[in-house]
A protein has these predicted regions:
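A short, N-terminal "cap"/entry segment at the start of jelly-roll beta-barrel domains
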Residues: 1-32, 42, 111-134
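Short strand-coil-strand connectors
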Residues: 26, 63-67, 90
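Short strand-connecting beta-turns/loops that link adjacent beta-strands
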Residues: 26-27, 48, 92-93
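Short, conserved beta-strand element in jelly-roll/cupin
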Residues: 34-36, 45-62
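Ligand-binding loop in jelly-roll beta-barrel domains
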Residues: 61, 81-108
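Short acidic-glycine-tyrosine-enriched beta hairpin
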Residues: 66-81
Length: 134
């Protein structure tokens, strides 16, 4: 049995959200994601992995190509492999419990709101070109 207290494991940074990997199991990992008010994730996907979020406390908005949904305590969101998504935190600190499983856990981003100097990596450019060509 593995036990974690998300509040005790939490780490916050005013300049960016923190994703602290708590452990790994065969085929995946599990994380506490810590968000300060107003922080926004990159608009990204995990080409080969499913990503699952559970809102422990706080909340915000999750966006995909299909629209947006409120993320509130108790909300459970599943992103299948390659689904583009962006999380924007609300007005209070938020703890999200995240599980990633399946293939490789890397992400590919298309944009990063609030970071004017951010640029896609060559791997990200190539990935989205290949997806558009399919």
């Amino acid at each position: 049995m593995i036990v974690h207290d998300l509040r005790e494991e939490s780490e916050f940074d005013p300049s960016k959200h923190i994703e602290k990997i708590l452990g790994t199991l065969e085929g995946g990992d599990y994380t506490v994601a810590c968000w300060e008010p107003g922080q926004v994730s990159p608009y990204h996907c995990h080409p080969d992995a499913t990503e699952i979020y559970f809102c422990f406390e706080g909340g915000g908005i999750m966006r995909t190509l299909d629209g947006e949904v409120p993320v509130t305590p108790g909300a459970f969101i599943v992103h299948p492999p390659a689904e583009l998504h962006e999380y924007e935190n609300g007005s209070e600190r938020t703890l999200l419990f995240r599980v990633r499983y399946g293939g490789e856990k890397y992400s590919r981003a298309t944009q990063r709101r609030g970071y004017p100097d951010w640029k896609q990596s060559p791997e990200e450019v190539e990935y989205f070109k290949s997806v558009a060509a399919e």
